[in-house]
Amino acid sequence: MTKVLVLYYSSYGHIEAMANEIAQGARSTGAQVDIKRVPELMPEDVAKNSGVKLDQDAPVAKPDDLVNYDAVIFGSPTRFGNMASQMRNFLDMTGGLWAQGKLVGKIGSVFTSTGTGGGNETTIQSFHTTLFHHGFVVVGLPYSCPELADISEVKGGSPLGAGTIAGADGSRMPSDKEIAMARFQGKHVAEIAAKLSA
């Protein structure tokens, strides 16, 4: 059975919501899917004062968890065009896995959330360098996903990966089209992982 990990960091719940949709898409293929999050780095009082959603159901991952999966789908909000520091910190702890080549040949994919759309693709690309160093086979979101080419409304996502636009104040949660793209990406990644691990 194909094993997929959806690994994310979410401050305000947008990426958490997308992670659940990505996982649903992957599960639709019959894959075993786990959802985990990376550790929060902010002191608890600072996080609470900033409105960070601390009560998330997903367990906290450890870097060694990554070796147990055929595919890892990473999710992070945009921070000035890059992944969040919490995700960067987690990936920086995978040096031992890199030295041993433990992630070579696994599928890697990325999804994101932005306030107004700026940084969507650069955030995903900020993952790609690390994933390539580890030897991941990187998978995006192809145009066979019909919602990707639909321009009837403002939405996140690109061929690099699914995304959501939260609004400058964070009040907008993922739309139906963004959810459809997330599910498509999860399904697409799981299907490719199944083919490569057969």
Curated annotation (Swiss-Prot):
Domain Flavodoxin-like: 4-189
Binding site for NAD(+): Y12
Positions that bind FMN: 10-15, 78-80, 113-118, 133
EC number of this enzyme: 1.6.5.2
One GO CC term on file: membrane
Pfam families documented for this protein: FMN_red (PF03358)
Leading EC class: oxidoreductase
Superkingdom of origin: Bacteria
Keyword Nucleotide-binding: yes
NCBIfam families: flav_wrbA, PRK03767.1
Protein name as it appears in the record: NAD(P)H dehydrogenase (quinone)
Lineage: Bacteria, Pseudomonadati, Pseudomonadota, Gammaproteobacteria, Oceanospirillales
